[in-house]
Amino acid sequence: MAYPFELGFQDATSPIMEELLHFHDHTLMIVFLISSLVLYIISLMLTTKLTHTSTMDAQEVETIWTILPAIILILIALPSLRILYMMDEINDPSLTVKTMGHQWYWSYEYTDYEDLNFDSYMIPTSDLNPGELRLLEVDNRVVLPMELPIRMLISSEDVLHSWAVPSLGLKTDAIPGRLNQATLTSTRPGLYYGQCSEICGSNHSFMPIVLELVPLKHFENWSSSML
């Protein structure tokens, strides 16, 4: 989860989020090197009056600043495309959960079970217990098994929403009349918080998401108690 004054990403809890963190570091290194080079050239231009008389006809320089940016873009694009394909790949999911966005709450349906569905509303600040998080706790958590591929089907009943859980690397738009899908696999148990990430009206800030990732045995016990 996030911490006050946190500057970086949340701790990765899924293979996809780990890949995104590596890609972020890879891209940031390239951007830092380019920025340093540009600042160095600007500082040289400001601190010296020397000029190159052949700048208007420098074929070698033009060749370099054409080929070098192309190579840099390829170094950024290839890992990005790899992660995009990984995010879209869903092979034989162990569980499918349908998520519907409403103004202003979420509803969930476990499609592999005959009658397992519920609504998830934010708990008002006045009803919170000691230690619970303001604007992030819900009355019904989404309980899922860890270390298994899970498919999320995401849509909306009314306006645009966005179902996002940062520590799992998930952010999928909930669009009325359209069914989007995402996949998640948690590498460890715990509570993972998210929020609606698309402005959807006056109570947009009050649509938290809470995933409770548990071992498979605990999930089976929970699902049996809910049926």
UniProtKB/Swiss-Prot annotation:
Residues 1-14, 88-227 are mitochondrial intermembrane. Residues 46-59 are mitochondrial matrix. Its EC number is 7.1.1.9. The chain crosses the membrane at residues 15-45, 60-87. It comes from the Eukaryota. This is Cytochrome c oxidase subunit 2. SUPFAM superfamilies: Cupredoxins (SSF49503), Cytochrome c oxidase subunit II-like, transmembrane region (SSF81464). The gene is MT-CO2. The lineage of its organism: Eukaryota, Metazoa, Chordata, Craniata, Vertebrata.
